[in-house]
Regions:
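Acidic, Ser/Pro/Thr-rich low-complexity regulatory regions
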Residues: 1-106
């Protein structure tokens, strides 16, 4: 199922959806960091921020994989997490939408 062919319009939509979801997650991470930094009063608070950033980087790098062979799984996960809505999948083939929604339901 991962070897489905991607049309030119699907590739463009995939890139736009991927970038939009990634950008939202990065903005959330930056805002959380700013809040924690503003509240930091001890060295332990600073080290905790470093741990937070390291963990978020691993999480985001592992989640956002723009290989076409992985995108359906990536989008399924984003739907499951509430970062991508089902109506944002319109424009992908029905096979791709079905696969994404199956992944989201796991």
């Amino acid at each position: 199922m991962h070897d489905l062919k991607w049309s030119k319009s699907e590739k463009k939509l995939a890139r736009n959806v991927f970038n939009a979801c990634l950008q939202v997650e990065l903005v959330e991470m930056v805002n959380t960091f700013k809040s924690r930094a503003a509240a930091a009063t001890t060295a332990d608070d600073v080290w905790a921020m470093e741990e937070f950033l390291t963990q978020k980087r691993r999480e985001i790098d592992g989640k956002y994989d723009f290989r076409y062979s992985q995108l359906l799984v990536v989008f399924g996960r984003l739907v499951r997490e509430g970062r991508l809505r089902e109506d944002e999948l319109h424009g992908f083939s029905s096979d791709k939408q079905s696969f994404i929604l199956r992944i989201a339901s796991l």
